[in-house]
Amino acid sequence: MNLSDALKRFRKQYKVTQKRAAEIAGVAERVYQSYEYGKVIPAVTVLIALADFFDVSLDYLVGRSDKREINR
C-alpha cells in the first residue's frame, strides 16, 4: 500500500473528514487532499502528526514496516 492509500484508509477508518485530517496535520484542506491524491509528499512533521493521531508508527504509515504498533 502506498502513502496516499494509507492516509485515505486510516482517515476513513477513524471516520475523519479531509478537513479534520488537514487540521490535525496543520495544513490547508486542499494540501491534505493533494497528499491523498498522491500529488504531494507530506513533510515529516505532517507525517508524524498523522501517525500520532492514527496511533501507528511512522514506518507503518509510510509502508516501511508491517508492524502497526509504536514502540514506547
Question: What residue ranges belong to the model's regions?
Answer:
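DNA major-groove recognition helix of helix-turn-helix
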Residues: 36, 54, 65
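Short alpha-helical DNA-recognition segment
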Residues: 16-34
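Short, basic-rich loop-to-helix N-cap that marks the start of a DNA-contacting helix
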Residues: 38-49, 68
